[in-house]
UniProtKB/Swiss-Prot annotation:
SMART domains: BRCT (SM00292), HhH1 (SM00278), LIGANc (SM00532). This is DNA ligase. One of its GO terms (cellular component) is cytosol. The gene is ligA. It comes from Ralstonia nicotianae (strain ATCC BAA-1114 / GMI1000). GO terms for molecular function: DNA binding; DNA ligase (NAD+) activity; metal ion binding.
Amino acid sequence: MSKTEHPASGASPETRAAALRATLNRYAHEYYVLDQPSVPDAEYDRLYRELEALEAEHPELRTPDSPTLRVGGAVLPEFAPVRHVVPMLSIRTETDTTAGGALDFDASVRRELGLAESDPPVEYAAELKFDGLAINLRYEKGFLVQAATRGDGATGEDVTQNIRTIRQIPLGLRPVGGAVPDVLEVRGEVYMRRDDFERLNARQRERGDKTFVNPRNTAAGAVRQLDPKMAAERPLSFFAYGLGEAAGWSGMPDTHSGMLDALVAYGFPVSKERAAVKGGEGLVQFHAAIGAKRDSLPFDIDGVVYKVNSLALQRELGFRTREPRWAVAHKYPAQEALTTVESIGVQVGRTGAITPVARLVPVFVGGVTVTNATLHNEDEVRRKDVRVGDTVIVRRAGDVIPEVVAVVLERRPMEDVPGSDLFNPTQQPKHPPFELPRSCPVCGSHVVREEGEAVARCSGGLFCSAQRKEAIRHFAGRRMMDIEGLGERYIDNLVELEYVHGIADLYRLTLDDFLEMKRRADERDGVTPETVAAGKIATKWAENLLDGIRASKTPPLARFLFAMGIRHVGESTAKTLADWLGSLAIVRRAPAPLLLTLPDVGATVAEAIADFFAEPKNQQALDALLTAGVAPQGEHPPSAKLRDQLEPAELYAALGVPKLTAIRSKQLATLVPSLAQLANVDTAQLEGLPADVAASLLAWLDADDHRTRLGTLDALRAELLAAMPAGAAEEGALSGKTVVLTGTLPTLSRDEAKAMLEAAGAKVSGSVSKKTDYVVAGVEAGSKLARAQELGVRVLDEAGMLALLQNPPGDSA
């Protein structure tokens, strides 16, 4: 290769630098001005680093329009320009996303300060790097007079009227010590919480309007709305994190963390996810702690930021070109990346859901190599117009299944339309739009999509081997039946080699079945295990599997219900069914109106549960499990809390009779005080109701055998009332108490301990606060234990927790 060629492209350094500048400036315009980025941040950062390295090697190539000499985007002409008194400079981003990035920054600071290895560690303020729009708020004599965007760092845009609509931002400062600074510029980030973003998009869909791509762009677009009323409709939030100009501030703090505390006192929201830490190791720990929780934060972050805490040391360290030496942004592995769609297929889920899946050129994103990404459903594929050959943005966060966020349309493969020529060039996409298959790719059954459903489904049921596999995987899962050792490979072989046709078949398997299955699978795959080659047969794995299956026969009722794979029934709803109805026999017989009276059970869920247990094939599958020896544990009489839900007015309201509102249901209950009477009611008995309501009720009673069903519901109601404990609704022994679990317990799993505490009425929380009553600590308890000790919260070990459950507070036993 010639010395004049650049290795990334084979072009000369001058040509490559010009191409990079043009591309980066276009991407920056899309991101900062149009609020419509076409590529993820990681792609921009990669090209930026390439240009930065090229200009360092060839300084003569740096031009005035190089993005390496700028901070952000251009000023929008519709807003008045604002010159920043103190420039809003960006900070350097550490590209090493490992612990080494934090240690390198600490080493750099110590070098700049001339510190020896024996000198004390430097104290840093560690905080979040928010993913929103940077804003400068100017207060004079305690009142907000101006709000401006970062712009290019020197000049921003006046967005005061829009910022005033954000309720978190104070219009006036709270006096501290009876005074406020003469001038105070507070810098921070306008952002949008994830839940607010989801609600906003839900409203957009209801109106038939275009939905937004992500919270960051939505927040930025709202701030730049010319009409403040439109900006006010967007649910924006704000965090303060720094200062611009400050004058006439007596008692100004001498540390960054002290300054943030002062901003809280003045009335600004400051993120609680911050800490003052010592040295590089403290930075490493903060980076790891935030990394572990970032996907559970209610807002998006773009990494963390480290700042030398001492403001005096910040001044001593100063700046290099466009960045402070005393601060750095430390990112995490990119959650978005570019790749190419090789093909689009479908997966069949346990309920028959047909999910389109993009098969991708492997790409490293979110800390793992991703080869597949969900496209959710047919409508989503059409909306995004994902096609084979497209360059797409793929996102992966935490344990969430990777998804295709958007298509980079400018990179779509195109071809000439037949008949076009040099004078009439016409192009079209090389690949056609995706079409959902009309038959299941696994079993050949029809694919159907019911009216109002977003998801298409295979109609094959358990005849479809894909649905059988997924149903067994769900059933055997850790939070369901928890069958130890029954992994994906064994399930695939059991179904494919016809050993398991229904879930109950698991409990009829023998040692010989497993050994024969393994032999047949090895023959099919052309594998000869070492033990077989040596003339031996390994049996321990099969014995362990049988032990795991046998051990799963006595699950708690809630876990058994969750394991059944009822549509719309998750872990929480299964627990509600078990807690309130008490037994499998009652749950199986409960009609939709009764289920609808339970907490957090809506009409769709109630119908799904009732339909599941009314389906003959599901009844047969359930009976087969019970016959095979599966026996749910922890059954009890119906909860006394159910008594109020069984009042006729409550049940009438749950019947789904048109025009029979909750108020009219109470009125009906005074006229017709029992379900049995309602089943035989006539017009004369309904004279107290409005005529249209009475007519609607009589029409409902005459349709679909509703009178007979009312009689059945009335009999079940009487049975439940007779079976439940006498007296008022009972409370758990730990009702009203908040408990936090941390560390590894000696004999109980986290889920088991949580279930025991919740059964006693306790609320199990994930964080320690002043409202926490107990912390149950095991091995390697960590920061939650330290926080509990700091707050004086009572700490128990496993034995102490069990003793508490046996003898709760106020128990005389």
